[in-house]
Amino acid sequence: MASGAHLTCRAAFALAAAGMVALADGASGGAAAQGRLEARYDVTLAGIKLGQGTWIVDAGDDQFMAVASGMTTGLARVFGKGEGTSAARGLVRRNVFLPVSYSSTVTTGKKTEEVRITLNGGAVKEFEVKPPTPPSARRIPITDAHKRNVFDPMSASLIRVPDNGDLLAQDNCRRHAAIFDGRMRYDLTLAF
């Protein structure tokens, strides 16, 4: 299914606090060592902890890795157990993140869903979804065209910006990403 998502730049960078990551280039304009980000999150409602999560991104001169995990905790586990892990790995070429692999496992109650995607040059080479997505007349079938020039959901959340000191510059926010998550293909457009 193809669909679109439009965010303002301010909303996109608000997502940075929840997992979207902006990484800066070196002053020379080339790919300089990027560094590592580790973030831990607690989800609360009226002071009651309902969940927790972690997000780790490690970006170097020529490769990157991102891992996220989360789970329900405390009172929320009484009503529904849930946990998940996602990971993406890829290459950095000419200041562009090129995903190579993506995996995701999400368990809610007794149901587990797994997604595995292998990519090369922005094209999906292989993917597997367990359990398979049931056919539906309301769902647009995935074609080969939907699997070209795409990012996985995690790699799409990484934004490379120039090291000019202004992460919220309008040009940094004008981005478009075609995303394939194993079940559907959708667009994410960021605007200032």
Set out the residue ranges of the language-model regions.
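Poly-acidic low-complexity segments
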Residues: A2, G74, D152-P153
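Hydrophobic h-region of N-terminal signal peptides that target proteins for export
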Residues: A14-S28
